[in-house]
Amino acid sequence: MGAPALPPLWTALAIAVTLGSAVTLERWLRARFAAGKLAFGAAPPLQLPINDILAVFGVLWLSVYWPGGIWFGLVGAAAIAAVLRLHRIPLRRHFGLGTLSVWQWIGLSLWIAAAVFVPLQLLAGGCEKAFEHFGWPTPHEPAVDLFLHAEGWRQLALLFFAATVVAPFGEETLFRGFIQPLLRRQLPAWAAIGITALVFAGLHQHLLTLLPLFVFGIVLGLAYELSGSLLLCIAIHFWFNGFTALLLITGYGPQP
């Protein structure tokens, strides 16, 4: 069942925030490019022996079978950090942890999330309408079902933490912090970003949201490629998942 409409005032506010964020962000990016302060290649490529790459993915594969969906991201992040340390690759430099100040990555991530959240929700709604038109099933994402069937505020709080902290940290470390830099070593930026975004969308195993998640993956990949800051990607992902979770909690997301 589709999501109920927001009250008119909230709808108008969401549109105003989206348009304002998108227009000002586009102008800021254009000015930064023109001034030579922004360019592709800020994120360092990564080269590792094939055995170590396979070991990371082997650990990820095993973690899928462990109880609790959060293990996949956390175990993956731990395995990646261990491999990087093994090869004496500084985590701070590789993940760009000092590239932006705290206020810069918080503010910029909120700016980007505010610009893309509503368009991606509209794209997801369009995909749902298309599926319904062709008579294809439109099941919820597993994570959405967990929110819809949560029992009590304690379980909701745990789900909110998993969605806004654990998932962004684990997924961004894996996709933007590991897979994209590995591909970037051999491929141009656009190809590395696109392939990583496709894998990111596909591993969510939800055909209905494949296109919106792919576009979101492109946004995250561009953010990492242009800033070199994994924290920026984690924060964008935090805001996006947080906005989505708030819609579900307040009853304005998909219905059971």
What are these regions (language model features)?
Residues 67-75, 154-155, 159, 184-196, ...:
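Membrane-interface starts of transmembrane alpha-helices
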Residues 105, 118, 122, 170-195, ...:
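Membrane-interface helix/loop boundary segments of multi-pass membrane proteins
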Residues 20-27, 161-185:
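Transmembrane alpha-helical segments in integral membrane proteins
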